[in-house]
Curated annotation (Swiss-Prot):
Name under which the protein is recorded: Endoglucanase 8
Catalytic reactions of this protein: Endohydrolysis of (1->4)-beta-D-glucosidic linkages in cellulose, lichenin and cereal beta-D-glucans
Function noted in UniProt: Required for cellulose formation of the cell wall.
Tissue-wise expression: Expressed in young expanding tissues. Expressed in xylem cells, young epidermal cells and newly formed cell walls.
Domain of life (superkingdom): Eukaryota
Length: 492
């Protein structure tokens, strides 16, 4: 029996990783990288620059913030609607920065565009944090917006401004914002030292505010942010996450001491196989573990143990898996928009594989051993699934390959562009485009949708928003993955 239990996980792992899909024809990762970054230009809010490449988009929401006497123009729409949610926007910016920090050297000419994508986010976050003791965390009323189907250029729904402050704390969104600014300061350290210092100084101030005035922003702003980007996981992980990035960016002892002192209090070891805009636990442990593996910080050893636990928890074929894999090989987590989990967790696998390689280490996982090569193979399998190696034979990236989603849940993409239809298209008038069986008239190149369900089935239909809606935080970690595989299409 012992022999059988040892062999079966190995066979299952081999089947998931090495069975050649009959639908595979190899992938142009460089092209996919270019498109994954181009997607962010389709999500831009505010005054568009002269070098805007997706020409069907135009200026929008130029007066955002005016009702509160501030300028909050710019930034990104999070998904297929016209709201600017600060929590996922900050996480998107953090992950774009981490993608560049770890994999920018392999992005070639696309590195320049990736850096631009980061700066579009940080320029907005600097506006949102310009007043000490205040963070503007949302522009737009989600209920009003979701009751309409309008392109952003025509938007006439409520542009209500929401903020956190000392009396109405939000350590989660403030901690993530601090992380984003700190991570981006590393990206700009050599490219623009003055801008980098501004980002780091602001990150320091925002983190101090998040830490001193503790609380979840969904308690302060429940009716505005829930159920859309409610903090379901608590704010503790964002405080550790923000401190980890500030430590990496500043190398100040105070942040190291904060992390060590608060590891247990802020629950670094909780839900170690989760990572996304709401839950940073796995990301914290992988990020901090790099220093342990580089031999620089033995006092963080427990974070490496947590990171090893994360790795073992998501290996296909492990005895007690904490994630599921579809028959087609896709990593599946409960809830909607599954591709956000696929790209975020795959990013961590790839990042950790590189850290292990430099340290010449592996992760023992009971009957299996997670080598750096194995982790890269798992991550690459997920990327290849997204790009078309799946039972549907469908690329889940718009504009990549011959077959991809044509009816994505996205207002700007599905409603005729301003150049094609110059007159205003009103709130309810847009419903006919939402309900239309026709493909979207504007190609949101590079958008990765929520993806198939556990049976590998996908309805190419706008009303199925959990599967057909793209988000910025699906693409942000994918940029790093594609940056790596564009230069390393085979693993060793």
């Amino acid at each position: 029996m012992a022999r059988k239990s040892l062999i079966f996980p190995v066979i299952l792992l081999a089947v998931l990783l090495f069975s050649p899909p009959i639908y595979s024809a190899g992938h142009d990762y460089r092209d996919a990288l270019r498109k994954s970054i181009l997607f962010f230009e389709g999500q831009r809010s505010g005054k568009l620059p002269p070098d805007q490449r997706l020409k069907w988009r135009r200026d929008s929401a130029l007066r955002d913030g005016s009702s509160a006497g501030v300028d909050l123009s710019g930034g990104y729409y999070d998904a297929g609607d016209n709201i600017k949610f600060g929590f996922p926007m900050a996480f998107t910016t953090t992950m774009l920065s981490w993608s560049i920090i770890d994999f920018g050297k392999t992005m070639g000419p696309e590195l320049r565009n990736a850096v631009k994508a980061v700066k579009w986010g940080t320029d907005y976050l600097l506006k949102a944090t310009a007043i000490p003791g205040v963070v503007f965390v949302q522009v737009g009323d989600a209920y009003s917006d979701h009751n309409c189907w309008e392109r952003p250029e025509d938007m006439d729904t409520l542009r209500t401004v929401y903020k956190i402050d000392r009396a109405h704390p939000g350590s989660d969104v403030a901690g993530e914002t601090a992380a984003a600014l700190a991570a981006a300061s590393i990206v700009f350290r050599k490219r623009d030292p003055a801008y980098s210092r501004l980002l780091l100084d602001r990150a320091t101030r925002v983190f101090a505010f998040a830490n001193r005035y503790r609380g979840a922003y969904s308690n302060s702003l429940y009716h505005a942010v829930c159920p859309f980007y409610c903090d379901f996981n608590g704010y503790q992980d964002e405080l550790l996450w923000g401190a980890a990035w500030l430590h990496k960016a500043s190398r100040k002892r105070a942040y190291r001491e904060f992390i060590v002192k608060n590891e247990v209090i802020l629950k670094a070891g909780d839900t170690i196989n989760e990572f996304g805009w709401d839950n940073k636990h796995a990301g914290i442990n992988v990020l901090i573990s790099k220093e342990v593996l580089m031999g620089k910080a033995e006092y963080f050893e427990s974070f490496k143990q947590n990171a090893d636990g994360f790795i073992c928890s998501i290996l296909p074929g492990i005895s007690h898996p904490q994630v599921q894999y579809s028959r087609g090989g896709l990593l599946v987590k409960t809830g909607g928009s599954n591709m956000q989990h696929v790209t975020s967790l795959s990013f961590l696998l790839l990042a950790y594989s590189n850290y292990l390689s430099h340290a010449k280490k592996v992760v023992p996982c009971g009957e299996l051993t997670a080598s750096p090569s194995l982790l890269r193979q798992i991550a690459k399998r997920q990327v290849d699934y997204i790009l078309g190696d799946n039972p549907m034979g469908l690329s889940y990236m718009v504009g990549y390959g011959q077959k991809f989603p044509r009816r994505i849940h996205h207002r700007g993409s599905s409603v005729p562009s301003v150049s094609a239809h110059p007159s205003h298209i009103g709130c309810k008038e847009g419903s006919r485009y939402f309900l239309s069986p026709n493909p979207n008239p504007n190609l949101l190149v590079g958008a990765v949708v929520g993806g198939p369900n556990v049976t590998d089935a996908f309805p190419d239909s706008r009303p199925y928003f959990q599967q057909s809606e793209p988000t910025t935080y699906i693409n942000a970690p994918l940029v790093g993955l594609l940056g790596y595989f564009s230069a390393h299409s085979t693993w060793r």
